[in-house]
């Protein structure tokens, strides 16, 4: 399902632990890392899609997490032209994402990335809250920054909330 502007509806998932760290997943067979995310199926709400993707990609269920927040708006990113499939109809030029902030409520040993026949990820780790903004593939950075900024007051201890841009004082 692609909207009239060429964006595929999608959910993004930020899972945090009690230390203010976030779940950072390694893409299967690649050297790139990202937050879990996935498309919204026809007839599915963003929350339903989030729980489905959470189970498919990470092996966690609704009982393993608690929703702390969801983004107020859809956050969009465009794909680099080299990744757009121009021969598909309709053409998808990017993703529009509803983001969810979840807190892990179970033991992390429940994480299982091998539930699906074609797993999205083959590794994961806890990282500092702002780490993903600098490490994710460049075309997703602004969306990650915006989502994490919106969730910072909920996810992080007060002293660590401010995102410092590299090379700037303050």
Swiss-Prot record:
Example GO biological process: mRNA catabolic process
SUPFAM superfamilies membership: Nudix (SSF55811)
Domain Nudix hydrolase: 6-149
EC number(s) per entry: 3.6.1.-
Motif (Nudix box): 38-59
Gene assigned in the entry: rppH
Function comment: Accelerates the degradation of transcripts by removing pyrophosphate from the 5'-end of triphosphorylated RNA, leading to a more labile monophosphorylated state that can stimulate subsequent ribonuclease cleavage.
InterPro entries found in the cross-reference section: Nudix_hydrolase (IPR020476), NUDIX_hydrolase-like_dom_sf (IPR015797), NUDIX_hydrolase_CS (IPR020084), NUDIX_hydrolase_dom (IPR000086), RppH (IPR022927)
Membership in a protein family: Belongs to the Nudix hydrolase family. RppH subfamily.
Organism field: Aliivibrio salmonicida (strain LFI1238) (Vibrio salmonicida (strain LFI1238))
PANTHER family assigned: M7GPPPN-MRNA HYDROLASE
GO CC terms, sorted: cytoplasm
Example of a GO MF term: mRNA 5'-diphosphatase activity
Protein name: RNA pyrophosphohydrolase
PROSITE patterns in the record: NUDIX, NUDIX_BOX
